[in-house]
Regions:
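Mixed-charge, glycine-accented linear interaction segment located at domain edges/termini
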Residues: 12, 86-140
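A cross-family "folded-core" feature that marks the main globular domain of proteins
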Residues: 1-4, 13, 37-38, 52-54, ...
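The feature marks the first
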Residues: 1-32, 36
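Short cysteine/histidine-rich zinc-coordinating motifs and their immediately flanking basic loops
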Residues: 140-147
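Intrinsic, low-complexity N-terminal interaction/targeting segments
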Residues: 40-101, 105
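Short microdomains enriched in Cys/His and/or Lys/Arg
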Residues: 149-151
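Short, structured motif recognition centered on aromatic/hydrophobic residues
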Residues: 1-3, 22, 26, 77-81, ...
Length: 151
């Protein structure tokens, strides 16, 4: 995933499950904002930002996302993405600078655009096996729940 601002961009590795969870939480947040009238009607009805462009090159990962937090501040959705180690613990690279962290301040229409693209990308993948939930190749796959029989 890439986060862009004023000509700069950062690329982070993010798990497919994290993308799904982030999109679901964003959609839930928008519903809560609408229900609680916490955002202006103009912000809530603004069309989603459409971004179908490919990722910027070169694609060099800054870090792998571990912890993600979402907050609502001053009509902005603030997303913090922090690096994590293989043990799912926070990384602290340097005492002075702290862990790798990206903070993205997004408008509601940008969040809607993220949800649209996330759903498009996630649903474009291979279908899941109904028995084991692993991805199924066009020629099938060896299903561990079916004792290795091809499905």
């Amino acid at each position: 995933m890439q986060v862009k601002s004023e000509g700069n961009f950062n690329t982070v590795a993010i798990d497919k499950g994290q993308v799904i969870a982030l999109a679901e939480r964003f959609e839930e947040l928008i519903r809560e904002l609408r229900r609680g009238k916490l955002a202006t009607p103009e912000d809530l009805t603004a069309p989603a930002v459409k971004d179908d462009e490919p990722l910027e090159l070169p694609i060099e990962c800054d870090f792998t996302v571990g912890v993600i937090s979402i907050t609502w501040e001053n009509n902005n959705v603030v997303v913090n993405m922090q690096a994590a180690s293989q043990e799912d613990e926070l990384l602290i690279d340097d005492i002075d600078f702290g862990p790798d962290l990206i903070v993205a301040n997004l408008k509601i229409n940008q969040v809607k655009g993220f949800c649209d693209r996330a759903n498009l990308v996630v649903n474009a993948g291979r279908p899941a096996c109904p028995f084991c939930a692993l991805p199924v190749d066009p020629l099938g796959h060896l299903c561990p729940r079916a004792n290795g029989y091809r499905r």
